[in-house]
Every structure is written in structure tokens, then in C-alpha cells.
Amino acid sequence: MSVVEIEEGVFESTATIDNGSFGTRTIRFETGRLARQAAGAVVAYLDDETMLLSATTASKQPKEHFDFFPLTIDVEERMYAAGRIPGSFFRREGRPSTDAILTCRLIDRPLRPTFISGLRNEIQVVVTVLSLDPKDLYDVLAINAASASTQISGIPFNGPVGGVRVALIDGQWVAFPTVEQLEKAVFDMVVAGRKVGDAGNEDVAIMMVEAEATDKVIELVAGGAGAPTEAVVAEGLEAAKPFIAALCDAQAALAGAAGKETAEYPVFPDYAEDVYYSVASVATDALSEALTIAGKEARDDRTNEIKAEVVERLAEQYAGREKEIGAAYRSLTKKLVRQRILTDHFRIDGRGVTDIRALSAEVAVIPRAHGSALFERGETQIMGVTTLDMVKMAQQIDSLGPETSKRYMHHYNFPPYSTGETGRVGSPKRREIGHGALAERALMPVLPSVEEFPYAIRQVSEALSSNGSTSMGSVCASTLSLLNAGVPLKAPVAGIAMGLVSDDVEVEGGGVERRFVTLTDILGAEDAFGDMDFKCAGTKDFVTALQLDTKLDGIPSQVLAGALAQAKDARITILEVMAEAIDEPDEMSPYAPRITTIKVPVDKIGEVIGPKGKMINSITEETGASISIEDDGTVFVGASNGEAAQAAIDKINAIANPQLPKVGERFLGTVVKTTDFGAFVSLLPGRDGLVHISKLGRGKRINKVEDVAKVGDKLRVEIADIDNRGKISLVLVAEEEAGAATPEAPAPADAATSSS
């Protein structure tokens, strides 16, 4: 991979992505022109019009009192990148959009484990979107830009990291697909990794995967496309590796030409070896026994007791090093948990490696909610709640992404009491936003279209108790809740979290073998102590969403394929339990709005709305219905009961699809305007007639219209004449005839106006 010095001190490297018949994409990395005071700054281009600036900086001094690595990733969306002014009140960018937050997480997950262990200097990576072609998504380019700026910064970093989006389109995995190409994809995933191995024997270690079936997958599969099964997903991961390698090569070449020498940064190990050996000698036996306790609360109580005893016993020997004792104790716990899994194939709570904890599912748990459910898996408990409303309540999105509105909104809440702790409550943290987005993507492929189900849907997942994969529990609870709300899902979806433990294990004869053990339905501790966190959601037939993070330098393809197959077995088991609670959509809640869809001619939309919304507002006030109109003439009418909705529909149809009144027809109309020469009476929505002043006195002369007719009065009238311009002349019906008319025998058009 060659590097070009395009001017003095400005270097550029390029990665070319060849998608065959789908075209070629070019990713360029440039450094030396912008943000020169940052430790490392790189401008990344996707083709010619999408441009990001990534700047990496480090604090001068370490935060010695921190017991974690203080890495911060920020993504700044500038609306000028798309030639737009922000829609906020102050017309400037404010808090990051959901897209920006999710991109921060995409960058953080593969970058964080790539820094050297024990680093305590604050590291900040800021990615700014400077220009964006509407056909492109910027998130994957941001991963590469962040890695490249960090790689040249002189900070100890075991990169570079390459990131690519691959989409399955017409049977081919296409890298860096455009928004238009994604419309034809059945599956798309973001894969990040780095090159490992010696020259000539190199491979790509996959570090992070974020994948989903598209919302058109069922339609495309029905049309002959291949379903995104576990085997297909595994093929996609392999297909991503050459693209990642090319991106890593381009970054490495740039760093070779323009990168700084790696600086010396102080490293703070969690503990010294002497502390670990002392802790191990004191605690191993008691801790090994405690880790066989099945219940989380009892197990935690016992391990905390042992920890307190160890700290007390070693406090004098290691005065002032209590943090090291705690870290060493955690490391010993991790070693014992992993050892038992690898050698005995037993886990902390006594389960085998493929066992799922006890499952339960229940629907209709909240009285007035439109739909609700409770899903439990062991000590993880999730409540799902569904709310239905008019389509106009869809979320409006003001960001750089192609999405401008969102009809299905999935919100995830993780209160501190779910883990028995205290903490801050309020606006969602990045983790909550990420978990909600994952559950949302898992369900999108099975949601009905707006034509099939004309509602905006808000799904809320409440993590009431947590001990392992609340995000996948949210998928299960949401499926149950949506069905309880009457949403006609195309198929039920369930999710499961998988784990992986690997290490060199001594075997008989004195040899050593590398052993991989995949765990089904991991606990929180197994997530923390394992080598992989792998969440997989789907129907009984295919995968709808997948998220993978690993700490290993590569997972053998057969191990990953086995984990996918193991996840499917668990998913089928969970779906069976869910089907016992509810297996088809329930009747809609009496508290949910009834929404009807009708079509009106596009050229009649203005008449239905009326000047300054006068007509549509009057229909809403008279009937109590809620009305929204789309640009294509689709009208959504929602009301708490069918009668109100039908009354509104009748009024809309009378305007948009009118039946012209005829001479001789009688109406009970409402006076809407008075003038010196008569009173205008509303007969049908949008159609008025005039009773001349000479006809208002019933044979008597009157001087002022308001003496006999005021705005709002009801008058029974008959059409006397319709001129060639459509203007209607009315006369009053004789009093004796009006009195003889009964509700059972209304005038011809009375039925359409009786709600006036």
C-alpha cells in the first residue's frame, strides 16, 4: 500500500474496495493539513463527497486514582455537511443525535481493547462530519478515521482497526453499500477487526459485529432471495475480512510515513504479582466453593465475605495497596470461573454449557396499557409495554442520516435498582440508547407496514431485574407485548446472549491444547469474565439482529459457526415458551385508538384541510376524531370509538368525494355567515348555500338578517336552485313541514349532517 506526499508535510494513503458489478468505493486517509495541534489528526474520505475529520488527543498527566481506562469517543454531526441549517430553536447543533451516539459506541467497542492495558491518561477521539453525500452512511468511515488518527498519534495502540459495512444484495456481500443499494439488501452488518499473525501468515481478527436483517427481508425472501440464516451470516463475516485487511493496510502505510514515534506513557497494572500470589494462597479454596452457589444473591454475599476476610488478613502486609488486593481477588475469581468451565464444563450457577435458565412469559400485566408483558429468564426480568397512536406521532428526526421519521420507537430503561444498587435516574445513558437500538433492529423486520397497521408504535422495555442480557430479554418481552397490543407481527422474535471461554488446557500426556467452550444464556459475571459477548435475535427461520464483541485475536470460523447454531437451538426453545403465553395477536385494547385509513385525491387535500386548517379543525372539533393527511392523499382517522371515526370519514368523503346536492333536497343546516343580503347555511362540509333575506321572513318583510338568523343557528332548508357556477339558492322549509319531519325519516342528506 503506497503513500503519497501530496504537498510538503501532507500525506495520503488509499484503500480501494472492489465490489465487482456493484462498483468500486475508494477510502482515502489524509494527514498533515487539518488540526495540526492534535496528537493525531486524519481526514477520511469515502469517494469524493463524504469527508470526516478525526482528532485524537491525550492528557498530559495520568489519572492515577482511576481504576479504569478513561477513553472518550465523541461524534460531532455538523448540519452544514448536508447543506442544512439545524432545525432547533437556536439554529445550531446541540446534544448528539441518536445516530451520533450509536456511532460513538461503534467506534469505542473495537478501539478500547486495542490500547495497552493499564493506561490511565485521558484519551479523547473526536470525529467531526464535515461533508456527507446523501447516498452514504458515515458510521463505518468514522471507525476507520478514529483508528487512523489514533495510530499516528504516538499513543500506545495495538492497531490499526478496520471497519466495513457489508450487505447481502442479490447473493453477493457488497462493501460500503449506498443507501439505495441497502434498499435491496436482506441483511447488513458492520464488522470491525485488525490484522494478526506474521507476514505471509496473516489473518483478520474480528473484534466487533453489529448486524441486522433489513425491514424488507421477508418480502425479499418471498421473492426468491436467500434468507439470512446462521450459515449465511458466518459467510458474511468471512467476506468482510479482505476489506478490513485493505483498510488496515492503508492506515498502517499512512502511520509509517507520517506517524509519531510511540511515546512512553506510565502504565498502572491493576495489581503486582506478589499481591496476586498472596490472595490466591489465602482465598482459592474458599472462593472455589463459593463459586458453586447457584443463587446470585447468596453467591455474591459469600464472595464479598471472603473478599473482606482477604483484605483484612493482608491489609497489614500490603498497607496502602487495598485496591491491588481487590483487583487481584477479581482476577482470581475470573481464573476459577473460567477453569471450571474449561475443565468440568460446569458454570457458576451449576448449569451445563448449553443450559438455559428457567423461563417464564406472561402478557397483559398492566391494566390500561395498550399492550404489556413480563418475560423472565433466571434472575433477569423485563417488562415490555406497547403504546399505539396516530402515525403523525412518529418521531421526527433531524440528523444527517437518511431517516427523517421513525414510526416504531423502542426505548430501553435500566434503573439502578435492577442490580440492587443506587444511582442516577433520568435521561438515558449511551448504554441504554444502544440496547434500545439493538432491540429495535431485532424487531423491525417483522413489523407490519403502515398500510397493514396504520399506527405509530412506542415500545418501552423496563429492565426490572438484571443478571445477564437484558437487551435480549427486551426482544422477547417486546414480542409478547406487541402481540398483546394486537400488532400483527409477521413472526415472533426471541433473543439469547452467548459467551465464549478459551484457554490453553493441559491434557493427558503432558501436552497443551487450545480449548473453546461456547456458553448459552450467559450471566453477568460470565459476560465480564468471558472472551466474547455474542447476542443473537431472530425468528425460527432466520437471524434478525446480531451483536458481537470479543477480546480474542480471532475466533476460528468453526467455533463461530457452532456458536450461531447453539444460539438458534436456544432461540427455538425460548420461542416455544413465549408461544404458550401468546401465539397470535390479541384483540386491541379498548383504550387504544381505532385508526382507519382512507384515500382522497391529491388535488382535494387542500379542500379537506381548508384555509389555515379551518376545515380539518372543524371536523376534529365536531367529531372528536384525530386526523392526519399524508402528501399522497392517505388520510389517517383515529378516534376512541368507531362512531366518531365514521362521522369524520363521512365529512372528509363529502368534501373529497362529494355527491352534488340536487334541487329539492332538504337539509338541517347550520348558519355559518350572515350578510346584509342573506344567511349562508352549511349543508355538507365545504358546501354552503344562501338563503336570501327576502326568503328568511316566511312571507314577512325583515330589515336585518340577524333578527331571524344568527351564526350557529340550525335551519331546515330546501335547495331551490343551483346556477351554472354551482352556487346554491335555498329557501326555508314551511314550519308545518319542518315540524312533521322526524329523526326516523330525515331529509335525504340529513344522515351526513346530523352530527353538526
UniProtKB/Swiss-Prot annotation:
NCBIfam families listed in its UniProt record: polynuc_phos, pppGpp_PNP, PRK11824.1
Family assignment from sequence similarity: Belongs to the polyribonucleotide nucleotidyltransferase family.
Localization (cell): Cytoplasm
Entry GO CC: cytosol
PANTHER family: POLYRIBONUCLEOTIDE NUCLEOTIDYLTRANSFERASE, POLYRIBONUCLEOTIDE NUCLEOTIDYLTRANSFERASE 1, MITOCHONDRIAL
GO molecular function per UniProt: 3'-5'-RNA exonuclease activity; magnesium ion binding; polyribonucleotide nucleotidyltransferase activity; RNA binding
Residue intervals of the KH domain: 593-652
Enzyme class: transferase
UniProt function note: Involved in mRNA degradation. Catalyzes the phosphorolysis of single-stranded polyribonucleotides processively in the 3'- to 5'-direction.
InterPro entries assigned to the protein according to its UniProt record, in alphabetical order: ExoRNase_PH_dom1 (IPR001247), ExoRNase_PH_dom2 (IPR015847), ExoRNase_PH_dom2_sf (IPR036345), GPSI/PNP (IPR014069), KH_dom (IPR004087), KH_dom_type_1 (IPR004088), KH_dom_type_1_sf (IPR036612), NA-bd_OB-fold (IPR012340)
Taxonomic lineage of the native organism: Bacteria, Bacillati, Actinomycetota, Actinomycetes, Mycobacteriales
Disulfide bonds: none
Protein name: Polyribonucleotide nucleotidyltransferase
Species of the source: Mycolicibacterium gilvum (strain PYR-GCK)
Reaction(s) the record says it catalyses: RNA(n+1) + phosphate = RNA(n) + a ribonucleoside 5'-diphosphate
Cofactor requirement: Mg(2+)
Residue sites binding Mg(2+) per the record: D527, D533
Biological processes, Gene Ontology terms: mRNA catabolic process; RNA processing
EC id: 2.7.7.8
Keyword Nucleotidyltransferase recorded: yes
Keywords linked to the UniProt accession: Cytoplasm, Magnesium, Metal-binding, Nucleotidyltransferase, RNA-binding, Transferase
SUPFAM superfamilies: Eukaryotic type KH-domain (KH-domain type I) (SSF54791), Nucleic acid-binding proteins (SSF50249), Polynucleotide phosphorylase/guanosine pentaphosphate synthase (PNPase/GPSI), domain 3 (SSF46915), Ribonuclease PH domain 2-like (SSF55666), Ribosomal protein S5 domain 2-like (SSF54211)
S1 motif domain span: 664-733
